[in-house]
Amino acid sequence: MNQKLGLKDQDQEIFDLIEQEKIRQKENILLIASENFVSQAVLDAQGSILTNKYAEGYPQARYYNGCKNVDQIEKIAIQRATKLFGAKYANVQPHSGSQANMGAFQALLKPGDKILGLSLMDGGHLTHGHKLSFSGGFYEAHFYNVHPQTEMLDYDEIRKVALKVKPKLIIAGYSAYSKTINFKKFRQIADEVNAYLMADIAHIAGLVACGLHPCPFEANADVVTSTMHKTLRGPRGGLILTNKEEVFKKINRGIFPGIQGGPCIHTIAAKAVAFQEAMMPSFKEYQKQVIKNANTFAKAFQQKGYRIVSGGTDNHLFLIDVKHKNPEFTGSKIANMLEKINIVVNKNTIPFDQEKPFVTSGIRIGTPAMTTVGFRENDFILVADLMDKAINHLDDESYLAQIKQQVLALLSKFNK
């Protein structure tokens, strides 16, 4: 093996698949709410020689020598993260959002402690107590629901559930919720039952960083967790923030040696780059456009007779109840059809869904990725029109082929 060979010469099979994925990303309208396009600078950092360095431990407290440079990189990432989110302490080592949540749980809870989060069906996340997740296996998980009529958080009902359950930890933050979260009300509820408050801002981190969504630290959240790769537009990875020194010490132990060994320094460098980018004025303008696009997009569907869960969106995503359009529709059927015309969404449960999680009654739509590409309101209005036409001709392959050409024509304007 010649280590100086590039990927194309060393492994043609993997090189070709990456090239195919590059084409797919250029030739599809990507509406997955949890995806985005990172900058070249983020890619450069993540693909750097930092991947060669093992650095178990924390800056100035490593188990390996030769960490002078990577210590500086991790310190910079921490400094930028705390500045961006207005926090005193940050752990930038979690490999993912799930591991960030796991590390926070390790810090705050003991096995068997009670946790309270939003039902997965209503927009929560697997790591907020689902039985198939560590969070439902190691801890006694309880759930609150959205209001059955408004499909929004019902803080009075959440309070009732909390008073009944008496959880050790309350989780606020979701994977499929399109309205603003009132963290201060969650803080009041948590204080009333003497619980920790953890905010999982994985989806809305970019909005929070720019002041376009309330920050959980304004409500004195005990812990804030996040991913990097959604609205924050960074590499895949996790982040934990807190303002409380004792909690921070426990978090550090919870991550290392609790659930991880050596951190991915190349990813931490990419996180640092993403934090710097998020402090630029242009990033706030981008986030404003993400919200404008999502709002316009959702309204375009409503005007065509689609039911948007909770009536609309305040952030970067929304859910469409496809069964309201046609009882024979399912989220999986619509998502699979849309992929044929180069529009990518994901099937998603909606509140009180009667379908199985791999079938669903809804689809989830997000605007971050295509806003990065350059889409504006009028582009999303056109996409809504194309999606509606395709849905109304679900089984007409010839018609769908025509719609696909219109999708490619739209994308060609942005791929020059």
UniProtKB/Swiss-Prot annotation:
Pathway given in the UniProt record: One-carbon metabolism; tetrahydrofolate interconversion; Amino-acid biosynthesis; glycine biosynthesis; glycine from L-serine: step 1/1
Site entry (Plays an important role in substrate specificity), positions: 229
Annotated InterPro entries: PyrdxlP-dep_Trfase (IPR015424), PyrdxlP-dep_Trfase_major (IPR015421), PyrdxlP-dep_Trfase_small (IPR015422), Ser_HO-MeTrfase (IPR001085), Ser_HO-MeTrfase-like (IPR049943), Ser_HO-MeTrfase_PLP_BS (IPR019798), SHMT-like_dom (IPR039429)
Compartments reported by the entry: Cytoplasm
PROSITE patterns recorded: SHMT (PS00096)
Cofactors (names): pyridoxal 5'-phosphate
Claim: ATP-binding is one of the keywords in the record: no
Biological process annotations from GO: glycine biosynthetic process from serine; tetrahydrofolate interconversion
UniProtKB keywords: Amino-acid biosynthesis, Cytoplasm, One-carbon metabolism, Pyridoxal phosphate, Transferase
GO cellular component, one term: cytosol
Binding of (6S)-5,6,7,8-tetrahydrofolate, residues: 120, 124-126, 246
CDD domains: SHMT
Modification sites for N6-(pyridoxal phosphate)lysine: 230
Amino-acid biosynthesis recorded as keyword: yes
Described purpose of this protein according to its UniProt entry: Catalyzes the reversible interconversion of serine and glycine with tetrahydrofolate (THF) serving as the one-carbon carrier. This reaction serves as the major source of one-carbon groups required for the biosynthesis of purines, thymidylate, methionine, and other important biomolecules. Also exhibits THF-independent aldolase activity toward beta-hydroxyamino acids, producing glycine and aldehydes, via a retro-aldol mechanism.
Family affiliation: Belongs to the SHMT family.
Subunit structure comment from the entry: Homodimer.
Family matches, as NCBIfam families: PRK00011.1
Official protein name in the record: Serine hydroxymethyltransferase
Organism annotation: Onion yellows phytoplasma (strain OY-M)
Gene name per UniProt: glyA
